[in-house]
Protein backbone atom coordinates (compact mmCIF):
# COMPACT_ATOMS: atom_id res chain seq x y z
CA UNK A 1 0.00 0.00 0.00
CA UNK A 2 2.83 2.40 0.91
CA UNK A 3 4.59 1.71 -2.39
CA UNK A 4 1.44 2.49 -4.36
CA UNK A 5 1.00 5.80 -2.52
CA UNK A 6 4.61 6.76 -3.23
CA UNK A 7 4.19 5.92 -6.93
CA UNK A 8 1.02 7.99 -7.12
CA UNK A 9 2.75 10.94 -5.47
CA UNK A 10 5.67 10.76 -7.90
CA UNK A 11 3.19 10.77 -10.79
CA UNK A 12 1.41 13.86 -9.49
CA UNK A 13 4.63 15.78 -8.80
CA UNK A 14 6.59 14.66 -11.84
CA UNK A 15 6.24 17.98 -13.74
CA UNK A 16 7.85 19.78 -10.84
CA UNK A 17 10.68 17.28 -10.32
CA UNK A 18 11.53 17.07 -14.03
CA UNK A 19 11.60 20.82 -14.52
CA UNK A 20 8.42 20.91 -16.62
CA UNK A 21 5.51 23.20 -15.74
CA UNK A 22 1.79 22.69 -15.95
CA UNK A 23 0.14 25.16 -18.38
CA UNK A 24 -3.30 25.75 -19.85
CA UNK A 25 -3.71 25.02 -23.55
CA UNK A 26 -5.46 28.37 -24.06
CA UNK A 27 -2.37 30.17 -22.72
CA UNK A 28 0.15 28.48 -25.02
CA UNK A 29 1.98 30.66 -27.61
CA UNK A 30 0.79 28.59 -30.57
CA UNK A 31 0.57 30.06 -34.05
CA UNK A 32 -3.20 29.93 -34.38
CA UNK A 33 -3.53 32.11 -31.27
CA UNK A 34 -0.99 34.75 -32.32
CA UNK A 35 -3.70 37.37 -32.88
CA UNK A 36 -5.12 36.83 -29.38
CA UNK A 37 -3.95 39.72 -27.15
CA UNK A 38 -1.76 38.22 -24.40
CA UNK A 39 -1.73 41.25 -22.10
CA UNK A 40 -4.67 41.97 -19.77
CA UNK A 41 -6.60 45.13 -20.54
CA UNK A 42 -7.32 47.81 -17.98
CA UNK A 43 -10.94 48.33 -16.84
CA UNK A 44 -11.13 51.58 -18.80
CA UNK A 45 -9.14 50.39 -21.83
CA UNK A 46 -12.09 50.79 -24.27
CA UNK A 47 -11.99 54.51 -23.53
CA UNK A 48 -8.53 55.05 -24.94
CA UNK A 49 -10.41 56.01 -28.13
CA UNK A 50 -14.07 56.29 -27.13
CA UNK A 51 -15.26 58.51 -29.96
CA UNK A 52 -14.58 55.88 -32.65
CA UNK A 53 -16.54 53.13 -30.93
CA UNK A 54 -19.35 55.51 -30.04
CA UNK A 55 -19.57 56.95 -33.56
CA UNK A 56 -19.67 53.51 -35.15
CA UNK A 57 -22.35 52.31 -32.77
CA UNK A 58 -24.45 55.42 -33.42
CA UNK A 59 -24.01 54.98 -37.18
CA UNK A 60 -25.19 51.37 -37.06
CA UNK A 61 -28.18 52.30 -34.91
CA UNK A 62 -29.14 55.02 -37.39
CA UNK A 63 -28.64 52.96 -40.56
CA UNK A 64 -28.68 49.24 -39.77
CA UNK A 65 -32.18 47.78 -39.33
CA UNK A 66 -30.91 44.91 -37.17
CA UNK A 67 -29.03 47.28 -34.86
CA UNK A 68 -32.14 49.46 -34.59
CA UNK A 69 -34.29 46.42 -33.83
CA UNK A 70 -31.87 45.15 -31.17
CA UNK A 71 -31.74 48.49 -29.34
CA UNK A 72 -35.49 49.01 -29.54
CA UNK A 73 -36.13 45.45 -28.32
CA UNK A 74 -33.96 45.95 -25.23
CA UNK A 75 -35.42 49.41 -24.57
CA UNK A 76 -39.02 48.25 -24.89
CA UNK A 77 -38.47 45.19 -22.71
CA UNK A 78 -36.50 46.93 -19.95
CA UNK A 79 -38.41 50.22 -19.81
CA UNK A 80 -41.60 49.58 -21.76
CA UNK A 81 -44.46 51.85 -22.68
CA UNK A 82 -45.19 52.83 -19.06
CA UNK A 83 -41.63 52.99 -17.77
CA UNK A 84 -40.50 51.95 -14.31
CA UNK A 85 -42.84 53.71 -11.90
CA UNK A 86 -42.57 54.11 -8.11
CA UNK A 87 -45.45 53.13 -5.85
CA UNK A 88 -45.30 55.30 -2.73
CA UNK A 89 -46.88 54.40 0.58
CA UNK A 90 -48.47 57.84 0.84
CA UNK A 91 -51.21 58.43 -1.72
CA UNK A 92 -50.69 62.20 -1.54
CA UNK A 93 -47.03 61.77 -2.43
CA UNK A 94 -48.07 59.41 -5.23
CA UNK A 95 -50.45 62.00 -6.68
CA UNK A 96 -47.78 64.70 -6.51
CA UNK A 97 -45.27 62.44 -8.29
CA UNK A 98 -47.71 61.50 -11.05
CA UNK A 99 -48.49 65.16 -11.68
CA UNK A 100 -44.77 66.01 -11.88
CA UNK A 101 -43.89 62.95 -13.99
CA UNK A 102 -46.26 64.04 -16.77
CA UNK A 103 -44.02 67.04 -17.61
CA UNK A 104 -40.61 66.58 -15.99
CA UNK A 105 -38.45 67.16 -19.08
CA UNK A 106 -36.27 70.27 -19.10
CA UNK A 107 -37.29 70.93 -22.71
CA UNK A 108 -40.98 70.61 -21.85
CA UNK A 109 -41.65 67.92 -24.47
CA UNK A 110 -41.22 64.57 -22.70
CA UNK A 111 -42.67 62.85 -19.67
CA UNK A 112 -41.04 60.37 -17.26
CA UNK A 113 -41.67 57.42 -19.55
CA UNK A 114 -40.20 59.09 -22.63
CA UNK A 115 -37.18 60.42 -20.72
CA UNK A 116 -36.37 56.92 -19.45
CA UNK A 117 -36.64 55.46 -22.94
CA UNK A 118 -34.26 58.08 -24.38
CA UNK A 119 -31.87 57.52 -21.49
CA UNK A 120 -31.76 53.74 -21.90
CA UNK A 121 -31.40 53.97 -25.67
CA UNK A 122 -28.45 56.34 -25.20
CA UNK A 123 -26.83 54.00 -22.67
CA UNK A 124 -27.22 50.99 -24.96
CA UNK A 125 -25.89 52.71 -28.07
CA UNK A 126 -23.28 55.07 -26.62
CA UNK A 127 -22.45 53.15 -23.46
CA UNK A 128 -23.36 55.84 -20.95
CA UNK A 129 -25.46 58.94 -20.39
CA UNK A 130 -25.73 61.86 -17.99
CA UNK A 131 -28.93 63.15 -16.38
CA UNK A 132 -28.90 66.75 -15.15
CA UNK A 133 -31.25 67.46 -12.22
CA UNK A 134 -32.20 71.09 -12.84
CA UNK A 135 -34.14 73.41 -10.58
CA UNK A 136 -36.94 74.56 -12.86
CA UNK A 137 -39.83 76.79 -11.82
CA UNK A 138 -41.79 75.73 -14.90
CA UNK A 139 -42.04 72.10 -13.74
CA UNK A 140 -45.52 71.23 -12.39
CA UNK A 141 -45.82 70.78 -8.63
CA UNK A 142 -42.13 70.35 -7.86
CA UNK A 143 -39.60 72.76 -9.46
CA UNK A 144 -37.27 70.07 -10.76
CA UNK A 145 -36.67 68.92 -14.33
CA UNK A 146 -34.51 66.28 -16.00
CA UNK A 147 -32.17 66.67 -18.96
CA UNK A 148 -30.53 63.66 -20.63
CA UNK A 149 -27.10 64.24 -22.19
CA UNK A 150 -24.97 61.89 -24.25
CA UNK A 151 -21.33 61.08 -23.37
CA UNK A 152 -20.08 63.55 -25.99
CA UNK A 153 -21.00 66.35 -23.54
CA UNK A 154 -18.20 65.28 -21.16
CA UNK A 155 -15.14 67.52 -21.53
CA UNK A 156 -12.42 64.86 -21.50
CA UNK A 157 -9.68 67.47 -21.92
CA UNK A 158 -10.12 68.44 -18.27
CA UNK A 159 -7.40 66.56 -16.39
CA UNK A 160 -5.42 67.39 -13.24
CA UNK A 161 -4.35 65.72 -10.01
CA UNK A 162 -8.01 65.13 -9.00
CA UNK A 163 -9.68 65.10 -12.41
CA UNK A 164 -9.39 62.37 -15.03
CA UNK A 165 -10.92 62.84 -18.49
CA UNK A 166 -13.54 65.28 -17.26
CA UNK A 167 -14.52 63.42 -14.06
CA UNK A 168 -13.43 64.91 -10.74
CA UNK A 169 -12.82 62.47 -7.88
CA UNK A 170 -12.76 62.63 -4.11
CA UNK A 171 -10.90 59.50 -3.19
CA UNK A 172 -12.48 56.71 -5.23
CA UNK A 173 -15.84 58.46 -5.58
CA UNK A 174 -16.73 60.85 -8.40
CA UNK A 175 -17.41 64.34 -7.07
CA UNK A 176 -18.58 66.01 -10.28
CA UNK A 177 -18.32 66.29 -14.05
CA UNK A 178 -17.05 68.89 -16.50
CA UNK A 179 -19.81 69.15 -19.11
CA UNK A 180 -20.00 71.25 -22.26
CA UNK A 181 -22.75 73.86 -22.33
CA UNK A 182 -23.59 72.87 -25.92
CA UNK A 183 -23.24 69.70 -27.93
CA UNK A 184 -19.62 69.85 -29.16
CA UNK A 185 -20.44 67.82 -32.26
CA UNK A 186 -22.59 70.64 -33.66
CA UNK A 187 -21.04 73.14 -36.02
CA UNK A 188 -20.26 76.43 -34.31
CA UNK A 189 -21.01 75.09 -30.82
CA UNK A 190 -19.26 76.65 -27.85
CA UNK A 191 -16.56 74.49 -26.28
CA UNK A 192 -16.95 76.07 -22.87
CA UNK A 193 -17.51 73.51 -20.11
CA UNK A 194 -18.91 73.95 -16.60
CA UNK A 195 -18.48 71.89 -13.46
CA UNK A 196 -21.60 70.02 -12.28
CA UNK A 197 -21.46 68.23 -8.89
CA UNK A 198 -22.79 64.69 -8.52
CA UNK A 199 -25.70 66.01 -6.44
CA UNK A 200 -27.03 67.59 -9.64
CA UNK A 201 -25.82 65.06 -12.21
CA UNK A 202 -26.29 61.31 -12.56
CA UNK A 203 -23.82 59.19 -14.53
CA UNK A 204 -25.62 56.13 -15.89
CA UNK A 205 -23.59 53.24 -17.30
CA UNK A 206 -23.11 49.51 -16.92
CA UNK A 207 -19.55 48.70 -15.75
CA UNK A 208 -18.14 45.76 -17.69
CA UNK A 209 -15.17 45.21 -15.35
CA UNK A 210 -14.21 45.88 -11.76
CA UNK A 211 -13.01 49.45 -11.41
CA UNK A 212 -14.54 50.67 -14.67
CA UNK A 213 -15.41 54.36 -14.46
CA UNK A 214 -16.95 54.64 -17.92
CA UNK A 215 -19.31 52.54 -19.97
CA UNK A 216 -18.99 51.25 -23.49
CA UNK A 217 -21.61 50.58 -26.15
CA UNK A 218 -23.59 47.41 -25.59
CA UNK A 219 -23.29 46.89 -29.35
CA UNK A 220 -19.49 46.65 -29.16
CA UNK A 221 -19.27 42.81 -29.25
CA UNK A 222 -21.48 42.62 -32.34
CA UNK A 223 -20.68 45.84 -34.22
CA UNK A 224 -18.47 44.12 -36.80
CA UNK A 225 -20.96 41.29 -37.26
CA UNK A 226 -23.83 43.75 -37.70
CA UNK A 227 -21.99 45.78 -40.31
CA UNK A 228 -20.63 42.83 -42.29
CA UNK A 229 -23.99 41.06 -42.31
CA UNK A 230 -25.65 44.24 -43.54
CA UNK A 231 -23.05 44.57 -46.32
CA UNK A 232 -23.56 40.92 -47.25
CA UNK A 233 -27.32 41.38 -47.49
CA UNK A 234 -26.92 44.55 -49.56
CA UNK A 235 -24.53 42.76 -51.94
CA UNK A 236 -26.98 39.88 -52.31
CA UNK A 237 -29.78 42.35 -53.03
CA UNK A 238 -27.75 44.20 -55.68
CA UNK A 239 -26.76 40.91 -57.30
CA UNK A 240 -30.39 39.80 -57.43
CA UNK A 241 -31.54 43.15 -58.83
CA UNK A 242 -28.89 43.02 -61.53
CA UNK A 243 -29.82 39.47 -62.43
CA UNK A 244 -33.51 40.36 -62.55
CA UNK A 245 -32.88 42.89 -65.33
CA UNK A 246 -32.40 39.96 -67.80
CA UNK A 247 -30.82 42.04 -70.56
CA UNK A 248 -29.66 40.86 -73.97
CA UNK A 249 -26.36 41.85 -75.58
CA UNK A 250 -25.61 42.01 -79.32
CA UNK A 251 -22.07 40.74 -79.88
CA UNK A 252 -20.13 41.96 -82.91
CA UNK A 253 -18.09 39.46 -84.87
CA UNK A 254 -15.61 42.21 -85.71
CA UNK A 255 -14.55 42.56 -82.07
CA UNK A 256 -13.68 45.86 -80.44
CA UNK A 257 -15.09 47.51 -77.35
CA UNK A 258 -17.72 50.12 -78.21
CA UNK A 259 -18.46 50.66 -74.50
CA UNK A 260 -15.08 52.36 -74.15
CA UNK A 261 -16.43 55.31 -76.13
CA UNK A 262 -17.52 58.29 -74.06
CA UNK A 263 -21.24 58.30 -73.32
CA UNK A 264 -21.74 54.84 -74.82
CA UNK A 265 -22.63 53.00 -71.60
CA UNK A 266 -26.37 52.20 -71.78
CA UNK A 267 -28.63 51.73 -68.80
CA UNK A 268 -29.83 48.21 -68.04
CA UNK A 269 -33.60 47.87 -67.89
CA UNK A 270 -35.84 44.80 -67.72
CA UNK A 271 -36.08 43.27 -71.18
CA UNK A 272 -33.60 45.69 -72.74
CA UNK A 273 -31.35 44.81 -75.69
CA UNK A 274 -27.94 46.44 -75.54
CA UNK A 275 -26.51 47.03 -79.00
CA UNK A 276 -22.74 46.90 -79.07
CA UNK A 277 -22.18 47.18 -82.85
CA UNK A 278 -24.03 46.26 -86.00
CA UNK A 279 -23.82 42.65 -86.33
CA UNK A 280 -24.03 39.17 -85.66
CA UNK A 281 -24.66 37.47 -82.39
CA UNK A 282 -27.15 37.81 -79.53
CA UNK A 283 -26.16 36.72 -76.04
CA UNK A 284 -28.44 36.82 -72.98
CA UNK A 285 -27.29 37.47 -69.43
CA UNK A 286 -27.50 34.64 -66.93
CA UNK A 287 -28.90 35.83 -63.58
CA UNK A 288 -26.74 34.50 -60.72
CA UNK A 289 -28.68 32.04 -58.59
CA UNK A 290 -29.32 32.67 -54.91
CA UNK A 291 -27.07 30.50 -52.79
CA UNK A 292 -28.81 27.47 -51.32
CA UNK A 293 -27.13 28.16 -47.96
CA UNK A 294 -28.24 31.81 -47.92
CA UNK A 295 -31.01 31.47 -45.32
CA UNK A 296 -29.08 29.17 -42.95
CA UNK A 297 -26.07 31.47 -43.11
CA UNK A 298 -28.10 34.60 -42.34
CA UNK A 299 -29.91 32.84 -39.50
CA UNK A 300 -26.60 31.69 -38.02
CA UNK A 301 -25.23 35.23 -38.11
CA UNK A 302 -28.38 36.66 -36.54
CA UNK A 303 -28.25 34.04 -33.79
CA UNK A 304 -24.66 35.06 -33.11
CA UNK A 305 -25.67 38.72 -32.89
CA UNK A 306 -28.66 37.92 -30.68
CA UNK A 307 -26.47 35.90 -28.32
CA UNK A 308 -23.99 38.77 -28.05
CA UNK A 309 -26.80 41.13 -27.02
CA UNK A 310 -28.69 38.73 -24.78
CA UNK A 311 -31.81 38.84 -26.96
CA UNK A 312 -33.74 35.81 -28.22
CA UNK A 313 -33.13 35.27 -31.92
CA UNK A 314 -36.86 35.32 -32.62
CA UNK A 315 -37.28 38.78 -31.10
CA UNK A 316 -34.29 40.17 -32.98
CA UNK A 317 -35.15 38.77 -36.41
CA UNK A 318 -38.93 38.43 -36.20
CA UNK A 319 -38.48 34.92 -37.62
CA UNK A 320 -40.89 32.57 -35.83
CA UNK A 321 -40.71 29.76 -38.38
CA UNK A 322 -38.61 27.45 -36.21
CA UNK A 323 -40.08 28.29 -32.81
CA UNK A 324 -41.81 25.65 -30.74
CA UNK A 325 -43.79 26.34 -27.60
CA UNK A 326 -41.06 24.88 -25.38
CA UNK A 327 -38.17 26.68 -27.07
CA UNK A 328 -40.04 29.98 -27.15
CA UNK A 329 -40.90 29.74 -23.47
CA UNK A 330 -37.33 28.80 -22.51
CA UNK A 331 -35.97 31.75 -24.50
CA UNK A 332 -38.37 34.20 -22.88
CA UNK A 333 -37.55 32.92 -19.38
CA UNK A 334 -33.85 33.59 -19.91
CA UNK A 335 -34.61 36.95 -21.52
CA UNK A 336 -36.74 37.87 -18.51
CA UNK A 337 -33.70 37.35 -16.26
CA UNK A 338 -31.62 39.58 -18.53
CA UNK A 339 -34.29 42.29 -18.46
CA UNK A 340 -34.67 42.13 -14.68
CA UNK A 341 -30.89 42.48 -14.29
CA UNK A 342 -31.01 45.71 -16.31
CA UNK A 343 -34.08 47.00 -14.50
CA UNK A 344 -33.06 46.31 -10.91
CA UNK A 345 -29.29 46.33 -11.34
CA UNK A 346 -28.94 49.47 -13.46
CA UNK A 347 -32.03 51.61 -13.99
CA UNK A 348 -33.57 51.53 -10.52
CA UNK A 349 -30.42 52.09 -8.39
CA UNK A 350 -28.60 54.49 -10.73
CA UNK A 351 -31.51 56.49 -12.17
CA UNK A 352 -34.91 55.99 -10.55
CA UNK A 353 -33.95 56.04 -6.87
CA UNK A 354 -31.59 59.06 -7.09
CA UNK A 355 -34.24 61.02 -8.98
CA UNK A 356 -36.87 60.21 -6.34
CA UNK A 357 -34.52 61.26 -3.53
CA UNK A 358 -33.71 64.57 -5.20
CA UNK A 359 -37.37 65.14 -6.10
CA UNK A 360 -38.43 64.58 -2.47
CA UNK A 361 -35.72 66.97 -1.21
CA UNK A 362 -36.85 69.74 -3.54
CA UNK A 363 -40.53 69.09 -2.81
CA UNK A 364 -39.96 69.44 0.94
CA UNK A 365 -37.76 72.51 0.48
CA UNK A 366 -40.42 74.42 -1.47
CA UNK A 367 -43.33 73.21 0.65
CA UNK A 368 -44.92 71.06 -2.04
CA UNK A 369 -45.22 68.28 0.55
CA UNK A 370 -45.06 68.20 4.36
CA UNK A 371 -41.61 67.82 5.86
CA UNK A 372 -42.69 64.60 7.59
CA UNK A 373 -44.34 63.13 4.46
CA UNK A 374 -43.58 59.46 3.90
CA UNK A 375 -41.67 59.26 0.61
CA UNK A 376 -40.84 55.58 0.98
CA UNK A 377 -41.22 53.72 -2.31
CA UNK A 378 -43.16 50.59 -1.54
CA UNK A 379 -42.40 48.96 -4.87
CA UNK A 380 -40.93 49.78 -8.26
CA UNK A 381 -43.34 48.69 -10.97
CA UNK A 382 -41.46 47.57 -14.07
CA UNK A 383 -42.96 46.34 -17.37
CA UNK A 384 -43.75 42.66 -17.37
CA UNK A 385 -42.68 40.23 -20.08
CA UNK A 386 -45.74 38.17 -20.94
CA UNK A 387 -45.15 34.48 -21.40
CA UNK A 388 -46.49 32.35 -24.24
CA UNK A 389 -49.02 30.49 -22.10
CA UNK A 390 -50.87 33.29 -20.34
CA UNK A 391 -53.39 30.90 -18.80
CA UNK A 392 -50.77 28.88 -16.95
CA UNK A 393 -49.13 32.11 -15.75
CA UNK A 394 -52.41 33.33 -14.28
CA UNK A 395 -53.12 29.98 -12.63
CA UNK A 396 -49.62 30.00 -11.13
CA UNK A 397 -50.17 33.49 -9.73
CA UNK A 398 -53.52 32.39 -8.34
CA UNK A 399 -51.94 29.44 -6.54
CA UNK A 400 -49.15 31.64 -5.15
CA UNK A 401 -51.67 34.10 -3.72
CA UNK A 402 -53.88 31.37 -2.25
CA UNK A 403 -50.85 29.66 -0.70
CA UNK A 404 -49.66 32.91 0.85
CA UNK A 405 -46.46 33.07 -1.19
CA UNK A 406 -47.43 36.40 -2.79
CA UNK A 407 -49.92 39.21 -2.28
CA UNK A 408 -52.50 40.54 -4.67
CA UNK A 409 -50.67 43.86 -4.58
CA UNK A 410 -47.48 42.20 -5.82
CA UNK A 411 -49.22 40.32 -8.63
CA UNK A 412 -51.22 43.36 -9.73
CA UNK A 413 -48.17 45.61 -9.42
CA UNK A 414 -46.31 43.54 -12.03
CA UNK A 415 -48.91 44.60 -14.59
CA UNK A 416 -48.25 48.30 -13.94
CA UNK A 417 -51.40 48.92 -11.88
CA UNK A 418 -51.90 49.78 -8.21
CA UNK A 419 -53.93 47.24 -6.26
CA UNK A 420 -55.88 50.08 -4.65
CA UNK A 421 -56.92 51.42 -8.06
CA UNK A 422 -57.94 47.95 -9.24
CA UNK A 423 -60.04 47.44 -6.09
CA UNK A 424 -61.79 50.76 -6.62
CA UNK A 425 -62.57 49.86 -10.24
CA UNK A 426 -63.92 46.44 -9.23
CA UNK A 427 -66.13 48.02 -6.56
CA UNK A 428 -67.38 50.60 -9.05
CA UNK A 429 -68.12 47.90 -11.63
CA UNK A 430 -70.05 45.85 -9.06
CA UNK A 431 -72.18 48.83 -8.03
CA UNK A 432 -72.99 49.62 -11.65
CA UNK A 433 -73.79 45.98 -12.46
CA UNK A 434 -76.09 45.68 -9.42
CA UNK A 435 -77.95 48.85 -10.35
CA UNK A 436 -78.56 47.45 -13.84
CA UNK A 437 -79.43 43.96 -12.65
CA UNK A 438 -76.45 42.37 -14.40
CA UNK A 439 -74.64 39.22 -13.26
CA UNK A 440 -71.18 38.28 -14.52
CA UNK A 441 -69.05 35.20 -13.96
CA UNK A 442 -66.28 37.54 -12.75
CA UNK A 443 -68.37 38.47 -9.67
CA UNK A 444 -67.69 35.83 -6.97
CA UNK A 445 -70.55 37.24 -4.89
CA UNK A 446 -73.04 35.77 -7.34
CA UNK A 447 -71.28 33.04 -9.34
CA UNK A 448 -68.84 30.25 -8.54
CA UNK A 449 -65.75 29.33 -10.54
CA UNK A 450 -67.92 26.82 -12.40
CA UNK A 451 -70.32 29.58 -13.46
CA UNK A 452 -73.11 28.50 -11.13
CA UNK A 453 -75.04 30.84 -8.88
CA UNK A 454 -73.45 31.37 -5.49
CA UNK A 455 -75.78 30.15 -2.70
CA UNK A 456 -77.18 32.88 -0.50
CA UNK A 457 -76.63 32.84 3.25
CA UNK A 458 -80.17 31.51 3.78
CA UNK A 459 -79.59 28.70 1.26
CA UNK A 460 -76.30 27.74 2.90
CA UNK A 461 -77.97 27.68 6.34
CA UNK A 462 -80.82 25.54 5.01
CA UNK A 463 -78.37 23.04 3.51
CA UNK A 464 -76.48 22.76 6.77
Report each predicted region and the residues it spans.
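Structured, mid-chain assembly/scaffold modules that mediate subunit interfaces
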Residues: 62-209, 400
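Extended, charged amphipathic alpha-helical segments
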Residues: 202-331, 369, 377-378
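Short coil/turn segments at secondary-structure boundaries
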Residues: 112, 133-135, 239-245, 316-320, ...
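C-terminal anchoring/interaction modules
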Residues: 1-12, 329, 346-381, 385-464
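Intrinsically disordered, low-complexity linkers and terminal tails enriched in Pro/Gly
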Residues: 13-32, 252-263, 445-464
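N-terminal-proximal low-complexity accessory segments that begin disordered
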Residues: 1-82, 461-463
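C-terminal amphipathic alpha-helical
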Residues: 109-132, 290-391, 395, 440-443
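Flexible loop/turn segments at secondary-structure boundaries
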Residues: 138-141, 184-186, 282-283, 315, ...
Amino acid sequence: MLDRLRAAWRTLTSPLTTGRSIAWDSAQPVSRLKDWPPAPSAPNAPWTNPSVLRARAQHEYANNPMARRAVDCLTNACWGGNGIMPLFRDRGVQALWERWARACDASGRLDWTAIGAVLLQTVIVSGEAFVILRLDEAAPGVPLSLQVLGPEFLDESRTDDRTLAGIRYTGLRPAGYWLFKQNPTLSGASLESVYVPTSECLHIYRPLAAGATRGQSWLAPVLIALRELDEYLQAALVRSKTGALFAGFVRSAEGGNPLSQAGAVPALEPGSMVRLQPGEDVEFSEPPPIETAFDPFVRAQLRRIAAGLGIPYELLSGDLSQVTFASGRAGLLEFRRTVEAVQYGLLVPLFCEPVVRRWAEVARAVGAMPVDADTTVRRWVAPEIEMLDRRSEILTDLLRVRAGFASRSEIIGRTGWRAEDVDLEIASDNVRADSLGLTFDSDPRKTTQQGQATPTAAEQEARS
